[in-house]
Regions:
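Residues that define the transmembrane beta-barrel architecture of outer-membrane proteins
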Residues: 34-40, 97-103, 117, 143, ...
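Boundary at the C-terminal end of the N-terminal hydrophobic targeting segment
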Residues: 15-19
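Outer-membrane beta-barrel translocator domains and adjoining extracellular loop/strand segments
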Residues: 35-40, 66-73, 131-141, 182-190
């Protein structure tokens, strides 16, 4: 009997090592710079045992907003030093359209609750590519394009429910941190250059749900 039980246990080890997963996640991301917006992502993973997995993820977040920090920076320059400058013009200068792509390596630890459900904690490290379409500071009627990068990290908790042998639904709440930035200059009417750093604080809470498939 003991040999039979040992055989079954050893049989499970390679089976666990074969578990791969693919997941689609949809939800809301609330970064400090841009405010709440829609986020969609893909996650791949590999289980080394039923409670621990490593994986990777890529997400896409989009937002259209007026950057309050840019308005404050430009309002600090006397109005007569930038031709055509008014408070409303500075708001046009701060109109921003962003596409954010966090790419991360993830680790997840699960804790069984019932035969069909788990709770889990996960964390990740990676980098972020931020594509920004914004108004030209000297001529707000024209748009400029910029790309900014930064390292990022995330920490979250969630729960799963298996509705078949090879699929489960899940929901998770997490915190994401990154702050891509670059320096820009504005030349006033007297020829003086004012240098500012434009930082996109992409730190905030994420609430998402999705479906994960096993193969």
């Amino acid at each position: 009997m003991k040999k039979y039980v040992l055989f079954l246990f050893l049989l499970q080890i390679p089976m666990f090592a074969q578990w791969n997963t693919s997941a689609i996640k949809l939800g809301t991301f609330i970064p400090s710079s841009a405010g709440a917006g829609f986020m969609v992502g893909y996650e791949g993973g590999h289980f080394f045992d039923p409670q621990f997995s490593l994986g990777w993820s890529i997400d896409w977040f989009h937002a259209n907003y007026t950057d309050a920090q840019v308005v404050n920076d430009l309002n600090g320059i006397p109005l007569d030093q930038i031709p055509g400058t008014t408070g409303s013009t500075n708001e046009l200068r701060a109109k921003t359209n962003i596409h954010d792509f966090p790419i991360m390596a993830l680790a997840t630890v699960r804790f069984p609750v019932t035969p069909l459900s788990d709770v889990y904690i996960n964390g990740g490290l990676g980098f972020e590519a931020l594509f920004i379409d914004y108004s030209n500071y000297q001529n707000p009627s024209q748009n400029d394009f910029k790309t900014a990068f930064d390292f990022n990290w995330t920490l979250g908790v969630g729960g799963t429910y298996g509705f078949s042998k090879k699929a489960e639904v899940f929901a998770e709440l997490g915190y994401h941190s990154s702050a891509p930035s670059w320096d820009y200059q504005v030349t006033d009417a007297n020829g003086y250059k004012h240098t500012f750093q434009r930082t996109f604080d992409m730190s905030g809470m994420m609430l998402r749900a999705g479906v994960r498939f096993y193969y």
